[in-house]
């Protein structure tokens, strides 16, 4: 995969986002494009970031940690997508711009506890299923 092909594909997706945003009366700037790099190694991930796509998602914490450390000279905003085990929150938090995995109260409490410990504010997307709201109730 070449840098030129990656940059061209990103540009095409951004054009589509701009067209759709305009049709819906929104601004393209209000839409965040997140490139999911879970099947790609460091080299391709670097090319994506160098092409200007700086919001990158990974669903495997170990790979996210490794990529974040090896690509730390690039201003990448890392997104943890998918499930995250509570025991990996402490190690993950320093790298994560946005958690897309707020599906359980126990995980949310752990993220909040760790964020408070390091005096940070952590953004999280909540997953809410109307049929399963009892999972968010405190017991």
Describe the residue ranges of each PLM region.
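Conserved alpha/beta-domain cores
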Residues: 1-139
């Amino acid at each position: 995969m070449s840098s030129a092909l990656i940059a061209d594909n990103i540009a095409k997706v951004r054009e589509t986002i701009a067209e759709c945003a305009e049709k819906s009366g929104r601004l393209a700037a209000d839409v965040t494009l997140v490139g999911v790099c879970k099947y790609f190694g460091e080299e391709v991930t670097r090319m994506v970031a160098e092409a200007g796509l700086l919001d990158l998602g990974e669903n495997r914490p170990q790979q996210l940690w490794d990529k974040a450390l090896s690509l730390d000279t690039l201003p990448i905003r890392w997104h943890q997508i998918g499930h995250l085990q509570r025991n990996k929150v402490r190690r993950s938090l320093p790298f994560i711009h946005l958690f897309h995995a707020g599906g359980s109260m126990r995980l949310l409490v752990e993220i909040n506890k760790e964020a408070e410990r390091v005096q940070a504010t952590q953004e999280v997307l909540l997953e809410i299923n109307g049929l399963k709201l009892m999972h968010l109730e405190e017991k």
